């Protein structure tokens, strides 16, 4: 089979050490990946015009009630997001023209709307990281904000690489010494965490933000 870059800049097997083994440290990985990537601009496929019965591909529709949660709490997400490729592009353009120059500083403050908020759109395929990459690289000269933002794309690439090479990390620690870390199994504590009721303000704010908007600020995710 063949790999096609549908979700990343570089496929995981394209970026390796000289001996063919995967990188486990971010900095050398991204230095190699950033220099390796060459953008391939999508081309129109004239053969698609011959597909007269393309509508038949979608005759077996999936009913929304079969895939959506039983609780309708997600309805409020409509206040915060407008899912579409067009709106993802507008969000990116707004970020690049108005926010990215200060991204290096403002991204560290969860109370400030200083990030791109593009992660839901990237995750659902409404915008591709290659487009984000191109738009960022069109800005001359590059300021610290652009560099920091592109670096975050690098972390996403690195995560995809690690998961492909080490799928066991989805259910365990990549570094086995962390397996000895004490784990408290307490349903009451777990529910308090999910509801944003732990008593730790920064944790609770993040969980409530997630429940309200379906999104959590990057810095809070790290907490």
Residue ranges and their predicted role:
Residues 15-16, 26, 103, 183, ...:
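Short clusters of hydrophobic/aromatic residues that line enzyme substrate/ligand-binding pockets
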Residues 160, 165, 189-223:
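C-terminal substrate/ligand-recognition segments
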Residues 28-177:
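Glycine/tryptophan-enriched, flexible segments
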């Amino acid at each position: 089979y063949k790999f096609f870059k549908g979700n990343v800049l570089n496929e995981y097997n394209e970026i390796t050490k000289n001996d063919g083994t995967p990188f486990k440290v971010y900095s050398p990985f991204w230095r190699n990946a950033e220099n390796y990537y060459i953008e391939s601009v999508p081309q129109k496929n004239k053969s698609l015009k011959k597909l007269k019965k393309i509508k038949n591909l979608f005759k077996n529709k999936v009913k929304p009630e079969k895939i959506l949660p039983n609780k309708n709490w997600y309805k409020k997400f409509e206040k915060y997001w407008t899912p579409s490729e067009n709106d993802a592009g507008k969000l990116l353009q707004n970020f690049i023209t108005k926010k990215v120059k200060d991204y290096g500083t403002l991204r560290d403050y969860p109370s400030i709307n200083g990030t791109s908020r593009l992660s839901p759109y990237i995750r659902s395929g409404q915008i591709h990281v290659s487009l984000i990459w191109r738009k960022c690289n069109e800005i001359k000269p590059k300021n610290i904000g652009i560099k920091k933002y592109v670096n975050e794309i690098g972390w996403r690439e690195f995560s995809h690489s690690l998961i492909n090479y080490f799928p066991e990390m989805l259910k365990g620690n990549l570094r086995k010494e962390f397996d000895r870390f004490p784990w408290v199994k307490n349903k009451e504590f777990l529910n308090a965490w999910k509801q944003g009721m732990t008593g730790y303000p920064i944790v609770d704010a993040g969980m409530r933000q997630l429940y309200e908007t379906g999104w959590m600020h990057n810095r809070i995710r790290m907490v």
